[in-house]
C-alpha cells in the first residue's frame, strides 16, 4: 500500500523561514593579565633561559612588533614553578597540560556562555543545540559534555564537539550553527569557543623561531553566541544575520600552519609566507562571497577578520586597499587580548556591535549593511561568512 505521507511537507515544516541570526554574545578571560612590554623578561626568567641573550633580544622585537598591549593567561608563575617541564622546549609534559585544560577550558567556556544566555534573556531549557570548539586539549566525554553539566542544560541537548581545528574555527562554528538553525525550526544554538594556551606554552629554542612567534602572540579567552532563525522580536534582539558561509583550502599552502599533539604538548609550525598566502588569495574568496550581492568595493563592507598577527592584517589591508578604519575592531582585539585562536572573531563581533552602538553608527556593523567574517588557520583553511547588520535603533518590545 502506497504511503500517503507528504515528505516535502514534513521537511518544509522542519525548516526555519528566515536566516540564522546572532542573538547574543558573551566573552570571558582568565583573571591573570600579562602586559606585552613585560613579557620577554618574564618569559625568559620563568623558563630559565636568561643566558640566551641574543634570542631574548629577538623575542623582544617580536613582542614589540606584535601590536599586542596585553593578553590573559590561565597559567601563572606559581603554576609554572610547580610544573617545570612545561618551561622546557621539548620535555614530556602532556599529562600536566591535559589535567589543567580538561577542567579549565569548559569552566572558562561556562563563564562566556552564562553572559550570552543572560543577554539573550531566555531560560537555558530553550537551548536545543550546543557546539563547543577548542584547540586546547582532548578528552572523553568531551568539553561539550562537561559544559552541558556545568550549565545544567537539558540532557537531550544536541551536542557537537570540535577539537584541534585551530584559528579558522571561529568561522566554522558559525557556519555549522547557521545550518543547524536554518534546518531545525525553532532551534536555539549555543556556540562556545574556549582556548587556553597551557597546551602550547614552552621555553625558547634558537633553531625553532616559529614556536617563539606563537609565544609572542597567543592568549587565553572564551566567547559564546546564541544563534537562531525567526527571532521573536518581542523578547529577542537580533545582532547580525548570517547570509552565507563557505570554507576553502588555499592553493599551494600545504604545511603553512601545522599543529601536532605530542608528549611535549601541542607544537605549532608556521611558514614565514603565511601572510603572503592569505593576502594573495583573499580577494577571490571575497568575490565568490559577494558577487551574488553585487558588491565589489571592499571598503563598503564592515570587517571581522581573525587577527593571526599584524603582518597578516597589514598585507590584507595593502592588497585590498582597505581604509585604516576597516580593521579597527580586529586590531583592537589583537591589542587587548592577543590571538585567542577560534574565540577571536567572536570577540571582534562583540567589539563591533558595542562600538557601533556607543558611536550611534546606525547599524551593528559600523553603520554599514553588509560585512564579512574571515577565519584563517591550519591547512591553510579559510572560512568566509557574509553578515548582514541590523539597525542599532531596534529595541525589544516589553
Curated annotation (Swiss-Prot):
Q: What is this protein called?
A: Chalcone synthase 1
Matching Gene3D superfamilies, A to Z?
3.40.47.10
This entry's Enzyme Commission designation comes to 2.3.1.74
Origin species, per record, is Gerbera hybrida
Q: Could you tell me one molecular function GO term of this UniProt entry?
A: naringenin-chalcone synthase activity
Gene label:
CHS1
| Source organism, top-level taxon | Eukaryota
Q: Where is the active site?
A: 167
Function description = The primary product of this enzyme is 4,2',4',6'-tetrahydroxychalcone (also termed naringenin-chalcone or chalcone) which can under specific conditions spontaneously isomerize into naringenin.
Q: What is the lineage of its organism?
A: Eukaryota, Viridiplantae, Streptophyta, Embryophyta, Tracheophyta
Gene Ontology terms describing biological process: flavonoid biosynthetic process; polyketide biosynthetic process
